[in-house]
């Protein structure tokens, strides 16, 4: 919010552009759902909080595996257009922390 109206700079809020242009020195990747290979920039410090079977283009500086929503713990999944929400139930007990647990510990 700037000068009485909303302001949005697409370059300031585009994570890929910030990384590509070397405007950051630390990248925190959060992904509890996908096992797709995550491309890491080895010139930056990379912290990954994610799926226990995550694959990486290079070894991250820090990797914290977390549980998968709807499998390892209950939760709510929202569609990005906010049309539907789905209650998720825990179906196994793998003893991995939730993302919330990790964030609460950091705060």
Give the predicted meaning of each segment.
Residues 1-107:
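Non-catalytic alpha/beta scaffold blocks inside enzyme catalytic domains
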């Amino acid at each position: 919010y700037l000068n009485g109206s909303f302001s949005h700079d697409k370059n300031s809020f585009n994570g890929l552009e910030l990384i590509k242009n070397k405007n950051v020195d630390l990248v925190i990747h959060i992904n509890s759902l996908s096992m797709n290979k995550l491309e890491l920039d080895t010139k930056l410090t990379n912290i990954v909080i994610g799926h226990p079977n995550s694959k990486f283009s290079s070894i991250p500086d820090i990797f914290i595996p977390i549980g998968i929503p709807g499998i390892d713990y209950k939760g709510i999944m929202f569609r990005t257009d906010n049309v539907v929400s789905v209650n998720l139930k825990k179906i196994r007990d793998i003893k991995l922390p939730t993302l919330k647990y990790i964030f609460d510990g950091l705060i």
